[in-house]
């Protein structure tokens, strides 16, 4: 896979090139289905006989629950307040929070911190998952020393079914 960044006047810059199967999403497969991709890859090298057993015990039509990874990007400013981001990290729906910056650090375009934060969230239904996602989109906040919002506002898109 390849990851790029684009900036007006600078064009496309390559950030990362890697032979990988998943980014952060492989952890979702484990969280939602109980199927560990890392274990599968290791079995492919060290215990080939285990692979059939792993697939036999797995049913893609019956997830343990619904899950998502909610990503947040930010403006290139110094972070002064992350209170809300840490409050969201403690939400009962969060299986794993990942806040990439520390207070006082400046958000950069690319590098070791690709996002402001991401949260692995889980729920018992798709509707509840959408509700939780909407709550995170509404509540997520990091501000700069002037109190200005750094977090780009995410929104759940509307999908319209058209009849032809």
Model-derived segments and spans:
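Active-site lining segments that contact anionic ligands and/or coordinate catalytic metals
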Residues: 9, 64-69, 92-96, 113-118
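Active-site "cap" helix and flanking loop/linker of ATP-utilizing ligase/carboxylase catalytic domains
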Residues: 1-2, 18-78
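Generic C-terminus detector
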Residues: 101-164
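Short proline/glycine-enriched turn/loop segments at secondary-structure junctions
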Residues: 56-60, 86-88, 105-110
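Short coil/turn motifs at secondary-structure junctions
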Residues: 9, 22-24, 124
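Glycine-rich active-site loop/lid that clamps phosphate-bearing ligands
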Residues: 72-102
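Internal nucleotide-binding/catalytic subdomain
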Residues: 1-10
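A short beta-strand motif that forms the metal-chelation/ATP-contact edge
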Residues: 10-20
């Amino acid at each position: 896979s390849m990851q790029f960044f684009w900036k007006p006047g600078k064009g496309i810059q390559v950030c990362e090139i890697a032979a990988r199967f998943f980014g952060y999403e492989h952890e979702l497969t484990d969280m939602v289905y109980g199927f560990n991709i890392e274990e599968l890859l290791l079995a492919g090298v060290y215990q080939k006989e285990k692979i059939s057993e792993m697939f036999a015990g797995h049913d893609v039509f019956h997830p343990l629950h619904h899950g998502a990874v909610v990503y947040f990007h930010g403006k290139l400013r110094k972070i002064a307040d992350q209170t809300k981001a840490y409050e969201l990290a403690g939400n009962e729906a969060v299986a794993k929070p990942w806040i990439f910056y520390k207070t006082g650090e400046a958000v950069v375009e690319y590098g070791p911190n690709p996002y402001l934060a991401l949260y692995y969230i889980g729920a018992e239904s798709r509707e509840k998952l959408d509700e939780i996602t909407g709550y995170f989109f509404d509540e997520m906040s990091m501000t700069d020393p002037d109190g200005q919002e750094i977090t780009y506002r995410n929104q759940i898109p509307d999908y319209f079914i058209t009849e032809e």
